[in-house]
């Protein structure tokens, strides 16, 4: 047995960026071209995932066809965003909803799927239309995905974006988009999508390369070993010379096919810089994207994803990982036995120098959680960075999950919604419609398997009766985030509903992939509590036309508030005001900020809240205030929505009004650094600009107003250099 104990990496002489300035954020197609920047901090970027979920917390539909409002029977709005940004992902159930309206900066582009022509006889070789700007492998349709239409083409917008469905039968969908703080260091300007320009071949070629070795050559170390039945075996220790650091660019293992099942539950552990706990600690199979290495139908690729793959060839099974994994001093790679000795294990690792400042990147983490008995009525917590690896603040990005959702080929677990929370938000900034939707499928994948560059259902029999043995009953899926990754600057809480309403008794296992550096890049600096006399006075709050403070008892948007007669999410009280004119207040900020995020808690019973936001300097003794426009703050929809889900493919649009008991919501607005940097306080003015849109044509208008319960200021800052 040959084990490499240490490898010295030659240090580079200088770095190519400044540690005091945020790294460049890859935008649009650059997010694919610059995939080697997966570990980089996204300071000033925020991700949001919206969907057609049941607003009452249940599983009506299931989670299909809930719309913000209807402009016409063939224009059912499901996403409405103000400001510049990029839509990075959209998922639909089969062709349902097509034709879709992609309204970019006021221009209505019609996007179709070829099954639209006759949805009762769907086209098996369906594609997105227009095909040139929406090509495979940035898009996939239901025959390949086994139930979903998926779109990863970046859709840029400079002022606004709306998405609407023309048809509402089974209109399930979720969508991921990014906003950027004005003045953020972007790799290219955001340009409005024109529905004509085709993605460049380099991006398509990258995604077509899924399943192959996509990493640069680098420095290679390799070896051969036997994994003991018990205990932990060090595979390699990589050492970096200061002040450079290194990046693991490829990590592979292979065993004879006869040892594949035994390898499934061997634990991979990787510790960066001799930290007290490993940042990667997960069963090998699940880490590489599959719940088991059982290959039910003898496929070459069990997993053919971009960052990982599992390939059966040459009488061996090969596992490869190409996530870039930075370290600053050392990387220790170990394997822990799982009850059976495994011989003839071959491994390789490739690495290169870290060519950027250390506080520009984060460690790679794969956090494993075992959920043998999910808690009744509560979401499973796949990751809470406040408690993992010593807890505290972390700054980084959430980049995916690999998860087992049943050990018994039970597929009803797939009704569970993903909900993700970032940087103290009480509202999920990401709310999905179901578990197989998150994994890139639809309708439980029809019980079939599939593997794509960024999503897949690699293993599991269609049913327990059809399983060839117990290994074949293990159902798993994966979802990786590249262009659509989700940044956080302080903490991340990644949750998944089990079953349709947190009632499942199935055994789940999850691996959550994320990049994170200890420390914060989003820092709270102040809070104004509306209705609190002392807080209003301290923040010079002024809103002459605002209502008197009023009490609200309600909830945030989570799962069912009651299950089996027991309350799961109790209501709570808070105090707020509403105004139909303007409010002003002062908030403290850090002078070294790179922009400020305002977070507002609001009463979501008031629909389509929109305001122009102005910023001024705080100057003692001066009566002159010079306001500068920071942008438009818009929160589309309300706790009332439209549900339209006719039974027939071409059924008439319905106008069912659904009102939830969830009136609390946290919402965010980004202020550019040119208005905030170098200041220790800013004066904020929000001027209400009403948006009068009925839930559907002819429905009475609901009273509109700007709701304020609290305002919090968070500053974007550079994270500290690693110790």
Residue ranges and their predicted role:
Residues 120-158, 301-305, 309-320, 326, ...:
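Beta-strand-rich ligand-recognition modules
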């Amino acid at each position: 047995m040959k084990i490499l104990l240490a490898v010295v990496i030659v240090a580079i002489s200088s770095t190519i960026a400044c540690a005091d300035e945020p790294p460049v954020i890859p935008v649009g197609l650059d997010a694919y071209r610059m995939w080697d920047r997966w570990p980089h901090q996204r300071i000033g970027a925020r991700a949001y995932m919206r969907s057609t979920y049941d607003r009452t917390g249940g599983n009506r539909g299931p989670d299909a066809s809930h719309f913000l409002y209807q402009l016409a029977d063939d224009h059912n709005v499901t996403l409405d965003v103000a400001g510049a940004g990029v839509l990075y992902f959209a998922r639909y159930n089969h062709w349902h909803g097509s034709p879709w309206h992609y309204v970019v900066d006021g221009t209505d582009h019609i996007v179709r799927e070829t099954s639209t022509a006759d949805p009762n006889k769907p086209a098996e070789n369906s594609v997105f239309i227009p095909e040139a700007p929406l090509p495979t492998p940035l898009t996939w349709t239901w025959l390949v995905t086994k139930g979903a239409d998926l779109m990863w083409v970046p859709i840029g917008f400079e002022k606004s974006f709306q998405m609407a469905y023309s048809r509402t039968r089974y209109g399930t969908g979720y969508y991921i988009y990014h906003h950027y703080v004005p003045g953020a260091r972007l790799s290219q300007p955001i340009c409005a999508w024109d529905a004509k320009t085709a993605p460049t071949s380099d991006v398509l070629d990258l995604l077509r390369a899924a399943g192959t070795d996509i990493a640069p050559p680098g420095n290679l170390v390799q070896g051969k070993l036997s994994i003991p039945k018990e205990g932990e075996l060090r595979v390699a220790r990589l050492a970096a010379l200061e002040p450079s650091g290194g990046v693991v660019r490829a990590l592979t293992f292979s065993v004879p096919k006869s040892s594949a099942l035994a390898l499934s539950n061997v634990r991979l552990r990787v510790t960066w810089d001799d930290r007290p706990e490993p940042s990667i600690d997960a069963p090998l199979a699940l880490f590489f994207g599959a719940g088991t290495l059982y290959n039910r139908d003898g496929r070459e690729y069990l997993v053919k994803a971009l960052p990982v793959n599992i390939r059966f060839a040459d009488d061996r099974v090969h596992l490869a990982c190409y996530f870039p994994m930075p370290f600053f001093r050392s990387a220790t790679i170990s394997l822990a036995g799982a009850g059976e000795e495994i011989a003839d294990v071959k491994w390789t690792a490739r690495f290169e120098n870290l060519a950027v400042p250390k506080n520009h990147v984060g460690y790679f983490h794969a956090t494993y959680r075992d959920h043998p008995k999910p808690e009744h009525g509560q979401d499973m917590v796949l990751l809470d960075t406040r408690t993992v690896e010593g807890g505290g603040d972390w700054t980084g990005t959430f980049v995916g999950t690999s998860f087992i959702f049943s050990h018994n080929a039970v597929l009803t677990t797939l009704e569970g919604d993903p909900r993700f929370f970032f940087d103290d938000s009480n509202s999920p900034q990401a709310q999905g419609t179901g578990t197989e939707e998150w994994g890139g499928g639809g309708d439980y994948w029809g019980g079939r398997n599939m593997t794509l560059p960024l999503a897949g259902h690699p293993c599991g029999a269609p049913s327990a009766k059809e399983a060839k043995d117990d290994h074949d009953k293990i159902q798993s899926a994966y979802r990786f985030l590249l262009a659509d990754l989700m940044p956080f600057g302080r903490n991340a809480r990644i949750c998944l509903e089990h079953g349709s309403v947190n009632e499942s008794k199935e055994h789940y296992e999850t691996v959550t992939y994320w990049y994170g550096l200890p420390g914060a890049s989003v820092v709270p600096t102040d809070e104004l509590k509306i209705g609190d006399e002392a807080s209003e006075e301290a923040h010079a709050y002024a809103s002459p036309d605002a209502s008197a403070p009023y009490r609200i008892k309600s909830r945030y948007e989570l799962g069912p508030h009651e299950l089996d007669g027991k309350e799961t999410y109790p209501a709570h009280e808070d105090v707020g005001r509403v105004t139909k004119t303007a409010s002003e207040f002062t908030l403290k900020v850090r002078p070294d900020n790179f922009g400020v995020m305002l977070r507002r808690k609001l009463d979501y019973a008031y629909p389509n809240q929109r305001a122009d936001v102005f910023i001024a300097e705080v100057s003692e003794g001066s009566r002159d205030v010079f306001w500068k426009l920071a942008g438009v703050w818009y929160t589309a929809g309300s706790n009332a929505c439209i549900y339209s889900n006719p039974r027939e493919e071409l059924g008439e649009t319905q106008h069912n009004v659904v009102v939830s008991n969830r009136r609390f919501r946290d919402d965010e607005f980004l202020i550019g650094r040119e208005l905030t940097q170098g200041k220790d306080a800013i004066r904020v003015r929000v001027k209400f600009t009403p948006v009068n849109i009925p839930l559907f044509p002819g429905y009475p208008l609901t009273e509109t107003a700007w709701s304020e319960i609290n305002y919090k200021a968070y500053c974007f800052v550079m994270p500290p250099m690693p110790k």
